[in-house]
């Protein structure tokens, strides 16, 4: 009907982890004629980075991209010190997933992958892991501790020189992070224009999460930017985010209401020659 010439349809952690993931892909193909592709964690991470690159600051030399999904969380740490500031966004756009897997310096673009990880916990899977813990604050504490254990060997540790790096930026793309920004802004209805690109410090994120814990499930259910259906899931996402910020505190967490979908679009445009 719309004469689509180029498309890419992907499935992520849910299909990777499901025992019948391949059967689901075959059923979609049979019933809709659409070809779904179960992408690897490295490709999911690459697309999340490309999709959020628009929020990269010109002065940023070290960037950590955080993508909190439903079934997994991707973290990608890039060193951009070998790239001219004006070329940094375009250089990231040219990243390939095999570069992530090798964790190396790309001689063509100058982008260095310091580290990357795909943690098999997202907002849904982490919540399910502790579904038997009824007390709100206890469940949050256990989820936070569990996730922090997973990332203990990722990237530069607290003992490294990160504290003295002035040009460090975290870009966060997920419903958790956009929701925290929206409630901090006091929005009565979610507004992408106000949230996308909004910046918070680690301390501000911590205070907002504390407000979620103090208010409890009932308060979260009544908040227009959270709601009853997400009152529990927001806490598993908050536990993930706070664990990351506890290890790598920052004054610049940039909220990205963009990610995987935009990454697919941009990468396809590069592939087809529409972006150079």
Language model segments and positions:
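Active-site loops of AMP-binding adenylate-forming
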Residues: 81
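Helical "lid/coupling" subdomains associated with nucleotide-phosphate turnover
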Residues: 1-4, 13-62, 77, 85-276
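Catalytic cores of RNA-modifying enzymes
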Residues: 66-68
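Acidic, divalent-metal-coordinating active-site segment for phosphoryl/phosphodiester hydrolysis
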Residues: 70-78
